[in-house]
Amino acid sequence: MVEVGVSDIAIYVPPFYLSHEELAKARGVPKEKYIMGLGNQKMAVIPNWEDAVTMAANAAMQVLEKTRTDPEDIQQLVVSTESGVDHSKAVASFVQGLLKIGTRCRVYEVKHACYGGTAGLVDSIDRISRNGKTSRKGLVIMTDIAKYGFGNAGESTQGAGAVALLVEKNPRLCSIDTSLNGVFSKDVFDFWRPTGHRVPIVDGKFSIECYLMALEGSVSEFRSNLGLEQGKLLDHMDYIIYHMPFTNMARKAHRRLIEIECEGKDLETQEEIYNQTFSDKVAPGLMGVREVGNIYTGSVYMGLISLLENEREKAEGKRIGIFSYGSGCGAEFLLYNMQTDISGIINSLHFKEQLDKRKEITFEQYTQFYSKSSEEVFYYPDEANSFKNRYTKFVFTGFKDHKRQYI
């Protein structure tokens, strides 16, 4: 049986960030509320010349360039987002044009809150696996701007970014057997954004309850599909990456997993197992959410990139459990089987380099970015070109005849 999975991955984050220390000072709260309470340190801030389209294209261009992939070989282009720019025209269509992907390609957008990226990935893997041509590839992109009300309780968990994955047969990074996936879904209102609302409505406590309920449900099916007894799952995975709207959500999730897998053990033993497995299996994937914040659909895959950059060759040949959750709600637990030689892919990630090259902004500058929507700004081509750099290949310049313009 031919393996199908991910051959390469790339991330794009905006060039600005606001520190949580600066945000706490402006909001008149102790910095520990954000840094210790959430576990975060910074949040990405997107400028007016970027949006979900530019971030998606900028992440995807990295993948195409470093793998030397012919855009004509892309058979399926999926963009998952809850930050769409048009009620009808898909973000994926804009990206298709910017990347010059051919017409013999299935192009569409997926929406299911933060779970949408995994839904698009699983669908692409299944489609590529059914296609007889080994040259056919899928390009799956997650792109989002997590934006809450100015001064809202969720403001400190904001962020922005995009992740792109290249899907094909005989993958170079990891294989994924989707028949093993554990899924869970239920109709709930834990996080939603009604039509016409610029920011979401969040029932924070209930959303965490839904997340943990979905984790338990998807893990149960995943374990059953693997044929494992309860209590054996932790030994089957070298690392675990949870969906992380904020850093400490990974702690809540892992504690629940330990309670499930260590049922019957005394609390002291459970705590020992939690501390050891969190340090070894979960902590290596936390860098991105600490530095960037929540990027919705791409959050769990930013965790994968963080793990790869931190663990490097130690991740070769390992098994990584992935828990993807989206409000509303839908969830899936997957297993990534890493290939044994991925050093070249890891060396081409440059995530830490992107983070280091960002510019810190003041709270006043953050206020200006927040108050000006992209619909109110237009940049002439010469001015817009000045915003480009090694990672920012595409920028938004405004509207012409109600059509979004990019260069």
Describe the function of each predicted region.
Residues 1-49, 152-220, 332-407:
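Condensing-enzyme catalytic core mediating Claisen C-C bond formation in acyl metabolism
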Residues 30, 53-67, 91, 210-227, ...:
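Short, well-ordered amphipathic alpha-helical segments that serve as non-catalytic structural scaffolds
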Residues 10-12, 80-86, 112-117, 142-147, ...:
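Acidic, glycine-rich active-site loops and adjacent beta-strand->loop/helix elements
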Residues 264-265, 279-356:
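C-terminal catalytic subdomain
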Residues 33-37, 41-53, 84-137, 143, ...:
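Conserved catalytic cysteine-centered active-site region
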Residues 6, 52-118, 229-257:
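Conserved beta-ketoacyl condensing-enzyme motif
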Residues 205-226, 231-259, 288, 293:
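A conserved active-site cap/scaffold subdomain adjacent to cofactor or substrate pockets
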Residues 129-164:
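Flexible, glycine-rich active-site loops centered on histidine and acidic residues
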